[in-house]
Structures are given as C-alpha cells and as structure tokens.
C-alpha cells in the first residue's frame, strides 16, 4: 500500500516507519510512506504556512498556497487513483468497517491540518473524503493520521504474521475481542480458564466466541444491535446470559 502524508511535522511519522508492525511493513516493502511538508512549498523567507481567517476570530488557518501545492505534489507522485483524505472532527467517524473500506484503496493521501483548520475551498476542490477518529479536539491531524495508517495497514496482506491475527481483532466481525491469557497458569489466585488448557480446539473456539459475544453485550451492547447473529452465536450468547444470571 502506498501512503502519502501532508504534514508540517514529518518527523512524527518515524513512529510509523521505524517501529512495530508498521515499521516491519515498511522494511519489507509492504507499506510505502512518503511525506510532503507545506513549508517546502512556501516562497517567503520565513516559510510562512499560516494565515488569518476572513471574518476575524481567534486562531489562524493553514495558508492555502503551500497546502494546495503540497497536495498537488503528492497527487503527482501517487497517480490518478489516489484518494485524498482530510483528518477532521467533522468527518465520518473511523470504525473497523471504515478501516476495511479504506484498506481496499491501494493509494491514500492523508492531509493533516493544524491551527484552526484549513480553507473550506481546499476541502471542496482537493479532498475526496473527511474522516474523524472521535468526538474530541486534537492539536493537529498527525495523530489521527497515524491511527488510520496503523489500523489500515493491519489489513494489508502480509503485514501481520498470520491473517488470523487481524481476523480475531476486536471489531473485525463487529464484536469485541475475547479475553487472552499467557503464562503462568495461576496469577495471584486467578487461574487460566481450564478450556484453554484442554487442547480441544473446537471447545476453545466456542469459548472464545461466547466470551467475545458476552463482553460485547456487557461493554458495548449497541454493537449487537447492528449485527445479525448466527444461530450458533445466539445460542452461545443466551448461555452466557443464563450463566451470568445464575452467578448474580
């Protein structure tokens, strides 16, 4: 997957290219990330990238010309099929379904705003989609962009050691993930569930699915409202609720 990022702070993206899953993906050629800094497209001796908003008010906006030129340069490098995304609180909220949709694109250009935002005309003429990572305010679009890159890259074939790792992640099937355990078998009087030590793969699968359903019911019940549960899932969830009521 090819990724371009428009940012005033390209150094921040070393967190993506140099570390963890995404760092290995870059090293192995599965993920290609390039940055364009609007400061490199300025024409004054101060490399000015902010400007006053019309109508007054607090704060500044990103200057139009350097930002637009940076986007054009990224488009030229990416090719015509690249999708330009602006990270914005007004955008569609990112969830796993959205991540799956974005992962189908082979080329993405992410525009990271700063200050109070960017000129609306840039959004109208240069941006294909707006996306948000949540209903809160951050200082810029870099952290949301890194969040999006990390989430999307996990779905690129070969990035994770086993595709099952992505398939078992929380939200991959609309459910929260099940509990996980490692050694020791007993920790401060808390034991690993016996089924996980049994070696019975089918029983382990059923336990994990039931725990995933139950955890979703308890922590994010609204997620279940959007799912059409299979007969197996409905039975497991009913058993979970029954056991929970007995232990109440």
From Swiss-Prot:
Molecular-function annotations in GO: tRNA (guanine(37)-N1)-methyltransferase activity
Originating gene: trmD
Subcellular location: Cytoplasm
Cross-referenced HAMAP family: TrmD (MF_00605)
Family to which this protein belongs: Belongs to the RNA methyltransferase TrmD family.
UniProt superkingdom: Bacteria
GO CC term, one of those recorded: cytosol
Matching Gene3D superfamilies: 3.40.1280.10, tRNA(m1g37)methyltransferase, domain 2
Catalysis performed (reactions): guanosine(37) in tRNA + S-adenosyl-L-methionine = N(1)-methylguanosine(37) in tRNA + S-adenosyl-L-homocysteine + H(+)
Name recorded for this polypeptide: tRNA (guanine-N(1)-)-methyltransferase
Oligomer and partners: Homodimer.
Keyword S-adenosyl-L-methionine attributed: yes
Pfam families for this protein: tRNA_m1G_MT
């Amino acid at each position: 997957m090819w990724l371009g990022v428009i940012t005033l702070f390209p150094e921040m993206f070393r967190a993506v290219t140099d570390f963890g899953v995404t760092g290995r993906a870059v090293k192995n050629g599965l993920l290609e990330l390039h940055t364009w800094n609007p400061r490199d497209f300025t024409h004054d001796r101060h490399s000015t990238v902010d400007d006053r908003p019309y109508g007054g008010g607090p704060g500044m906006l990103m200057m139009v010309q350097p930002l637009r030129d940076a986007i054009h340069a990224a488009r030229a490098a990416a090719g015509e099929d690249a999708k330009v995304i602006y990270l914005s609180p007004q955008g569609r909220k990112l969830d796993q379904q959205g991540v799956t949709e974005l992962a189908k694109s082979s080329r993405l250009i992410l525009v990271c705003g700063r200050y109070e935002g960017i000129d609306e005309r840039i959004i109208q003429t240069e941006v294909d989609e707006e996306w948000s990572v949540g209903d809160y305010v951050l200082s810029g679009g870099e952290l949301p962009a890194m969040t999006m890159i990390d989430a999307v890259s996990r779905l690129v074939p070969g990035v994770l050691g086993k595709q099952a790792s992505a398939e078992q992640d929380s939200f991959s099937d609309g459910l929260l993930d099940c509990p996980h355990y490692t050694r020791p078998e007993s920790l401060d009087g808390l034991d690993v569930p016996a089924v996980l030590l049994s070696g019975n793969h089918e029983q382990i699968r059923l336990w994990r699915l039931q725990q995933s359903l139950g955890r979703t019911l308890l922590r994010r019940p609204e997620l279940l409202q959007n799912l059409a549960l299979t007969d197996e899932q409905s039975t497991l969830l009913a058993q979970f609720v029954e056991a929970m009521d007995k232990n109440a």
